[in-house]
Structure formats: structure tokens, C-alpha cells
């Protein structure tokens, strides 16, 4: 049986619509900290890993390196992220500054509110299944 070509059956469209919805939800909650969800994700990953090369962070984020560099610029300009040449001089090591650590601390409760808001929309169990399914797809890709 042939798959219908109706736009609302497109997996990519549905995924992008969901991503936009979630981004708006998280951005709204993180706005008091002056962060977008993408910026928060970068800061949170740097806090967890302490130091990453741009290529490592891009791989974790599943982003093009050039897109990540553009995303890092405002974080560097705000003084939250520091980029220094690695010992071999061929790559950049990215770390959080002290003010970046403070910014993550300020944003975590706002992020938790966004998590709770999404769980309120779809139910906690469904939200967890949704996250786990997406994570599984990302790891398989």
C-alpha cells in the first residue's frame, strides 16, 4: 500500500512542528534569564563536561560546526563562555566562565518550569516516552 503524500503525514514536518512548539515553550520560560533553549543547552552541556572542543560539542548537539560557532558568539560576548586554543593549536577548547556557571544556576529553575509545563500539556509519562523515543532516534542516526 502506498504512503499518502498529504503534508500532515510527513514525519519531518511533524518533527519540525514539535521542535518549534517546544522551542517556543522553553524560550518563554528561559526569557527571564536572557537565554534561549539552544543557549541553555550549550551552557548546561559545558557545565556537565567542563571542557569540550567545538567539534565535540557540535557532535553532542547534532549541529553543524559552523552553526555552533554562530550560536557560541553571543554566549562569548556575554562572558559566559570562553574559547581558547587547545594545546595542539588546531582546535578550540570551550569552557564556562564563572559568570556562565552563575547563568546556568539562574536558568535551571526556569528550565524545570518549562519541563513541568510540557509534562502538564501531554502528561508526564507521555513526555518521558516522547523524549526517550527522540533520543533513541538521535542515537541511531
What are the roles of these predicted feature ranges?
Residues 44-48, 108:
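Short, locally clustered residues in the helix-turn-helix/winged-helix DNA-binding domain
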Residues 58:
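The alpha-helix within a helix-turn-helix
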Residues 21, 25, 41-44, 102:
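Pre-recognition alpha-helix immediately N-terminal to the DNA-recognition helix
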Residues 49-53:
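Short capping segments at the starts of secondary-structure elements
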Residues 54-55, 66, 73, 92:
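Residues within helix-turn-helix
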Residues 1-33, 96, 125, 132, ...:
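N-terminal leader segment of winged-helix/HTH proteins
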Residues 73-132:
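Charged, amphipathic alpha-helical coiled-coil/dimerization segments
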Residues 36-42, 100, 115:
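The N-cap/first-turn positions of alpha helices
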Amino acid at each position: 500500500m502506498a504512503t499518502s503524500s498529504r503534508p500532515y503525514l510527513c514525519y519531518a514536518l511533524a518533527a519540525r512542528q514539535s521542535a518549534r512548539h517546544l522551542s517556543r515553550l522553553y524560550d518563554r520560560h528561559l526569557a527571564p534569564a536572557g537565554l534561549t533553549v539552544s543557549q541553555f543547552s550549550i551552557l548546561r552541556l559545558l557545565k556537565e563536561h567542563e571542557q569540550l572542543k567545538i567539534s565535540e560539542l557540535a557532535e553532542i548537539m547534532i549541529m553543524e560546526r559552523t552553526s555552533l560557532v554562530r550560536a557560541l558568539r553571543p554566549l562569548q560576548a556575554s562572558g559566559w563562555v570562553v574559547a581558547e586554543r587547545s594545546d595542539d593549536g588546531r582546535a578550540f577548547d570551550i569552557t564556562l566562565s564563572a559568570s556562565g556557571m552563575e547563568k546556568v544556576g539562574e536558568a535551571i529553575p526556569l528550565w524545570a518550569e518549562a519541563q513541568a509545563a510540557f509534562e502538564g500539556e501531554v502528561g508526564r509519562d507521555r513526555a518521558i516516552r516522547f523524549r526517550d523515543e527522540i533520543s533513541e532516534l538521535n542515537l541511531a542516526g
